[in-house]
Amino acid sequence: MSTPCIITVAITGSVPRKEHDPAVPISVAEQIESTQAAFEAGAALAHVHVRNDDQSPTSDPARFAELLHGLRRACPGMIVQFSTGGRSGKGPERGGMLHLGCDMASLSTGSCNFPTIIYENHPDLIRFLAKRMREFGVKPEIEVFDLS
């Protein structure tokens, strides 16, 4: 008996830079190419972050739009999940791209300690992001980092 599963690919993340690994796809074109390779290998869902030209994380809706349109062309039928993570912005701008038509988005349900930072997710922000997701028909990926 087989068990159905969804393979998710997170090709960039918000931390790695080219200096850490030259193969990390940073530009939109690199991300599309890398995601397409994963899609062709069987990945069904892409969890995506976008970057500025200096490789820093961003919540820039224009970058997300460019990536989304490219992924829709290169990977038809793939589920696209936007990151609303805190390393790419503070407050409401973390949800500024949810109107673009992604299928899913991450929804962190609390704050936690990462090795070098506090990943802050204020209850008001969580409610705001959840409301925006509902408003635009985006399915949340509920993230629970710390149960304490």
Which residues fall in each region the model found?
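N-terminal small/glycine-rich loop or linker at the start of catalytic domains
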Residues: 1-23, 106-113
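Alpha-helix-loop-beta-strand connector modules within alpha/beta enzyme cores
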Residues: 3, 9, 56-82, 127-135
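Structural preference for beta-strand elements that scaffold enzyme active sites
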Residues: 4-10, 45-47, 77-81, 102-106, ...
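Active-site beta-loop-alpha junctions enriched in small/polar residues
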Residues: 10-14, 51-53, 83-87, 108-112, ...
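Glycine-rich, proline-tolerant flexible connector loops at the mouths of alpha/beta enzymes
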Residues: 19, 44-66, 114
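Conserved, mostly hydrophobic/aromatic
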Residues: 31, 38, 49, 105
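Catalytic cores of alpha/beta
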Residues: 88-100, 147-148
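Catalytic alpha/beta core domains of metabolic enzymes, predominantly
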Residues: 104-148
